[in-house]
Amino acid sequence: MNLYSKLKEREAKGSPIRIGLIGAGKFATMYLAQVPKTPGIRLARIADLAPDKARENLRRVGLDPAQFAISDDWEKLVADPQIDIVIEATGNPVAAVEHILAAFRHRKHVVNVTVEADAFCGPLLAQKAAEAGVVYSLAYGVQPALICDLVDWARAAGFPVVAAGRGHKWLPHFAQSTPETVWGYYGLTPEQARLGGLNPKMFNSFLDGSKPAIETTAVCNATGLTPAPGGLLYPPGSVEDIPSLMRPREEGGVLHHKGQVEVISSLTAEGVQIPYDIRFGVFVVFEGETDYIRRCFSEYGVKTDPSGRYACMYKRWHLIGLEAGISVAAVGLRGEPTGCATGWRADAVAVAKRDLREKEILDGEGGYTVAGRLVPAEVSLGENLLPLGLAHGWKLLRPVAAGQPLSWSDVAFDANAAAVKLRREMETSVAPGSDRSQYGQPQQASAPARRATAARSP
C-alpha cells in the first residue's frame, strides 16, 4: 500500500529501478505508456525481433525512440549490469523460457508476462529463481496475478478461500474454433479484423478455452487452489450469481471441492449475454465460518449466497500492461512477486480439436489442431500428457482422435530444446501436489541484490 511513496523516494535519491523489456507488442506498449508517468522507474533497453516495430510502438505512446537502446539482441539486454528487472513479454513460451533462464544466470529479477511458459514449467522456474537469489513473478495486469492478489487479500484477512478464478465468454462448441471461424463468434467480419490489425490465432486462443486453461494452471500452482478432476466447468452467471455458484455441490453450487479454481461464463447455455457479467474480470469467493462473521456480512450489505455463508470480492476488468508497474514496484522495492508458483498442482495439456492424422504438424494454442484443457498435475504426469505450451511445430507420430489429450509419445519432440529440458526436469524433480512456499521469495538470498539495486545511480 506504500509502493507509490517508495517509488518517489527512489526518484528523489536518483536510484530508479531499471527495466529491460523483451518483446514490444501490445502488452509491452501498454506498459510503456505508463513508464513516463511513474516515478522511480527507468526503461533501459528494449529487445524485439522487429526493432522498427518497437520504435513505432514507442512513438504511438508519445515516446522518442532515440532516447532508448533498442535492438533485436535479447542476450545483450539480460547481460546489461545496469538492468534490475527483465520483463518477458514475447508471448512465445519456448523463447520465454530461454530468456528467463538467461536472466536468472545474470542475477536479474523477472516479471513474466508469457503465462504460457509459466503454465508448463512455472514451479521449476520459481525454484531456479530462488537458487539464483532473484525474484520471479507473474505480471500484474494479466488475470492470474490479479487472482493471486485477491486470494492473498482474503487469506491475509483471515477468510478461507472457497474458489477463485476469472470470467470468460464460453460455450462448449467454442473448443473447436479455428482462426478461420473465430471472427464470427466475436461479431466481426474477416475484413474488419484485418483493418483492426487483430491476430486471429491469438484471439482464438482465448475463445477456444486455451487461455483460460493456461491462466488457471498458473493460479493453481501459485495459490494452492486445485482444479476439479474433469477440468474447468464454465458455469454461466452474473457477478451477483458468483457466491451461489461457487459453493460445494452438496450446498447448491457447482464446486467439486472447496479451494477450487474456476471460470464463469458470460453466456447462458443458449448463448444469451448475461447482464453484469465477469467476462473481463476476476473474483475470489470466501467463507464466513461463524455466525458472527455471517451477521457482519448481512449488516454491511455484503452480497452472499442464500445461506449468508459465502461472499465474493471481484474486479470486473483488468488493465493488461497498463497496470504491470505494480509487479515492477513489488519486485524492485519489496523483493516480492505478484504471483509465483509455490508447487505443482495443475497443468494445461493439449487436446485434439478434431481427428488428427499421423505426420500432421501441431500449431499450438489458438490454432487448427489443439486446444488447452486444465487437469490436475498428477493426472498430467501419470498419463504422460503433452503440455499445451510445447504443442507447436512438432510432427504427430500417430493419429489422435478428436477430444483426446495428446501424450509425449504421440509427437516427435526436440529433446534438446531448453524449454523441453526444463519441463522434463520438472517432471522428474517436482512432485505433483507439492507445496514449496519459498519458491519465488528468496528474501535472504536476494537482499544483497536489492541493496546493490538501491545503490545504483541513473
Whereabouts are the PLM-identified features?
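N-terminal Rossmann-like dinucleotide-binding module
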Residues: M1-V61, T216
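Conserved N-terminal Rossmann-fold NAD(P) cofactor-binding segment
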Residues: A50-D80
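Beta-loop-alpha module in the N-terminal Rossmann-like domain of NAD(P)-dependent dehydrogenases
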Residues: D72-R105, E116-G122
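Rossmann-fold NAD(P)-binding glycine/threonine-rich loop
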Residues: A95-A102, V115-V135, A139-V142, D152
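A short hydrophobic/small-residue beta-strand
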Residues: H109-V111
